[in-house]
Amino acid sequence: MMFERVLFLSVYLFSIGIYGLITSRNMVRALICLELILNSINLNLVTFSDLFDSRQLKGDIFAIFVIALAAAEAAIGLSILSSIHRNRKSTRINQSNFLNN
C-alpha cells in the first residue's frame, strides 16, 4: 500500500515538473522545475531499490549520484543565468535570443 502512494507522489511531482518546464517563461522557474523532475526520479530510484533489492543499495547509490549531478547542474545553470541577467537585464526565456545581439 505504501509503495503505491510513493509512486503516485513521484508521478505527481514529475507531472508538475514537466508542466512547469513546458509553460515556464522564467529561467529560474525552469531550473526549479528541472530539479523537481530530478527529485521525483530519485524518489523512484530509492523506492524500487527498497522494494526489489534491499540488500545491495544500488538504487540508493545511484540516487546519491543523481543528487550530486543535480547540484552541479544547479550551480552551472545559476551561473549561466547570472551572466545572462547581467548582459541582457532579463531572465525571461522568450526574450533571450542568443543568435543576435
UniProtKB/Swiss-Prot annotation:
It is a multi-pass membrane protein. It comes from the Eukaryota. One of its GO terms (biological process) is ATP synthesis coupled electron transport. It catalyses: a plastoquinone + NADH + (n+1) H(+)(in) = a plastoquinol + NAD(+) + n H(+)(out); a plastoquinone + NADPH + (n+1) H(+)(in) = a plastoquinol + NADP(+) + n H(+)(out). One of its GO terms (cellular component) is NADH dehydrogenase complex. One of its GO terms (molecular function) is quinone binding. Keywords: Chloroplast, Membrane, NAD, NADP, Plastid, Plastoquinone, Quinone, Thylakoid, Translocase, Transmembrane, Transmembrane helix, Transport. It is found in: Plastid, Chloroplast thylakoid membrane. It holds the Pfam family Oxidored_q2. Disulfide bonds: none annotated. Gene3D superfamilies: 1.10.287.3510. InterPro entries: NADH_UbQ_OxRdtase_chain4L/K, NUOK/Mnh_C1-like. The chain crosses the membrane at residues 2-22, 32-52, 61-81. Its main location: plastid. Its EC number is 7.1.1.-. PANTHER family: NADH-UBIQUINONE OXIDOREDUCTASE CHAIN 4L, NADH-UBIQUINONE OXIDOREDUCTASE SUBUNIT ND4L. NDH is composed of at least 16 different subunits, 5 of which are encoded in the nucleus. Belongs to the complex I subunit 4L family. NDH shuttles electrons from NAD(P)H:plastoquinone, via FMN and iron-sulfur (Fe-S) centers, to quinones in the photosynthetic chain and possibly in a chloroplast respiratory chain. The immediate electron acceptor for the enzyme in this species is believed to be plastoquinone. Couples the redox reaction to proton translocation, and thus conserves the redox energy in a proton gradient. This is NAD(P)H-quinone oxidoreductase subunit 4L, chloroplastic. The lineage of its organism: Eukaryota, Viridiplantae, Streptophyta, Embryophyta, Tracheophyta.
